[in-house]
Amino acid sequence: MVERKASVERNTLETQVKCSINLDGSGKARFDIGVPFLEHMLDQIARHGLIDLDIECKGDLHIDDHHTVEDVGITLGQAFAQAIGDKKGIYRYGHAYVPLDEALSRVVIDFSGRPGLQMHVPYTRASVGGFDVDLFQEFFQGFVNHALVTLHIDNLRGHNTHHQIETVFKAFGRALRMAIEQDERMAGQMPSTKGCL
């Protein structure tokens, strides 16, 4: 099997991001981003997606977290697009429901080649540990725009904002794992009647 790995660097006047991934990993993760709550959520993607992730970012955190969070999403999306290759033989679609106490979230993904995000998370607080939760919209928008996926995220219930967000990221990791899995019956075939994605 071809190794599905990628390393991407993205440098702007606002951030310098390095991202390495292995889609067929074991969930190992290392982060040096400077935004602890984001790192905690990225760890959920690695662990539940069985994706090895190594991300470093030096950003303009003296202003706020916005550019760092968005650019990490963009760079992760670029790494996914590179590592997934031509998409032959993958399941393409993935979905997951994940609970955490009172919270329940659903994530559905399609490696369609068409970027689109529908995200409905009615946060009960504006921040968690000083982190502006609205920035997760920017993270996922950056990811879908560059991974070229369609992504639906719904928090179905929950009143603890940390739990709401954590269920989203765990479900995202599990949906990714399902979608990128190699389907032996589709080996070498494109999972689309168009013949391309």
Curated annotation (Swiss-Prot):
Taken from the UniProt entry, a GO cellular component term is: cytoplasm
Q: Give the record's keywords alphabetically.
A: Amino-acid biosynthesis, Cytoplasm, Histidine biosynthesis, Lyase
The yes or no answer to whether the keyword Cytoplasm is present is yes
Q: Give the pathway listed in the UniProt entry for this protein.
A: Amino-acid biosynthesis; L-histidine biosynthesis; L-histidine from 5-phospho-alpha-D-ribose 1-diphosphate: step 6/9
| Pfam families hit by this protein | IGPD
Known CDD domains for this protein?
IGPD
Enzyme group, top EC level? lyase
Which PANTHER family has this protein been placed in? IMIDAZOLEGLYCEROL-PHOSPHATE DEHYDRATASE, IMIDAZOLEGLYCEROL-PHOSPHATE DEHYDRATASE HIS7
Protein name per its UniProtKB record: Imidazoleglycerol-phosphate dehydratase
Lineage, uppermost ranks: Bacteria, Pseudomonadati, Pseudomonadota, Gammaproteobacteria, Pseudomonadales
